[in-house]
């Protein structure tokens, strides 16, 4: 099994009551298979609720609890961890913190939104795309560049909304400005 290493992508959050949400999405390398076992690459993400940033991710051919444990260990410790109830999350040892294993999507809205942003902005992750990366390293590099830009965008968005004088939700910039 070929794997790509982990990367810590965001600074340690300053507030004490932090929430991290974990989720995974799948995609294909080379082409979309015609068999029933459709998934062959997993992108596992760990997202901070506030600020909305990707604090850890991994791209691999498997989504084992050991791999998720590496993502959890590479990020700063948080107060709460929320997941979507996949059984592999139960086997993960969280760093002495309270663990919430959620059985529905109500506590994972942030990470589901970030995964939707990943599929929106990265053409090779779009569901009905005909684009596929040929190598796992290429997919890793594309996601690495996007995560860096996404975290810069999130920090700029929080700073802008903190300093604004109006109640408008429009931003004078987008995530594409940070690529």
Regions found by a protein language model. Name each.
Residues 1-179:
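Residue-level recognition of single "structural anchor" positions
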